[in-house]
């Protein structure tokens, strides 16, 4: 089995890749960036702009967060580096070098892996559940709380990090989801017993760590639908993730569990350290 841990950092959002613990099975750590001068800390540094050279077929140039608008709309392209990185997080199936991996594990640039058996366990979980992630201990399993906690400058500031971006209307996005049938009570009724994290948090996930079965056709559809939410609505992918879970009925195995502890993964868990972002 081939495993890749991937992240993307454009525009200096993080200073350098965090070091990692070598895994018990062969694993590559791949860092997509526009900065060839970062200290690699063992990561494979890839500066090819796949978001331009291997564009997502989903981006028709007519969405609020399209990167490839043409004609009069071209000046409204969302080329904010925060938006660019969503391509690598949500539509990485377009990247040629990743096609041969069986498991892809997305890490936000702030995440440092501190256990040697993460890849091995993700192979096991993704083989059975297709996706694995961590519960978000701050939201009580309610997407309402995630949406209404997103009044943050990285979504609402048109000059965030001194780069232009369109207003990311997350409250409008949440209301659209309700109109489309999103069910806040879905998770209480979901019958699976195992892989629910701490049950009262089940239903909203930390997308700073998500492992995917890269050989599954269903996961390719999941990722396409997830990225489409970014193009259409906002770059707040923790709001769109539960909606896509409901729409596809692919429900992640949710940590913590007996193998990896951490009821409050924002603060501490046995798998990774979540550092504060470096903002230049």
List PLM regions with ranges.
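Core catalytic alpha/beta fold that binds nucleotide/phospho-ligands
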Residues: 45-54, 59, 65-86, 91, ...
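Short, solvent-exposed loop/turn segments at secondary-structure junctions
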Residues: 10-13, 35-37, 50-52, 76-77, ...
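Catalytic core and acceptor-binding pocket of nucleotide-sugar-dependent glycosyltransferases
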Residues: 158-280
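Residues that flank catalytic or metal-binding motifs in active/ligand-binding sites
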Residues: 1, 25, 89, 107, ...
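N-terminal anchoring/stem segment of glycosyltransferases
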Residues: 1-85, 96-101, 230-236, 247-250, ...
